[in-house]
């Protein structure tokens, strides 16, 4: 995922989270808002409760790989994906299915508005 497709600044994370549009399950909480670009921007956050830095980086890489499989970047949205304590590093397919469910819910909400 290229740099321009990422949300990096703390202030941008806070603005997206404060928009209070979100979907969540036991693995993820995804906050979203529309943006003025022709593409999506994605930020991933993994809390220190999930483990040491090595584990958190691995989790972020896995989530980025899942998003490359599932999400088309042509939708003008900003997403902040917060990985929750229920996430399991070993069970990639279950994590992928849970993420797909949430992204489908978000797409349905956007198309209904």
Regions found by a protein language model. Give the residues of each.
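Positively charged, solvent-exposed patches that mediate nucleic-acid binding
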Residues: 1-113
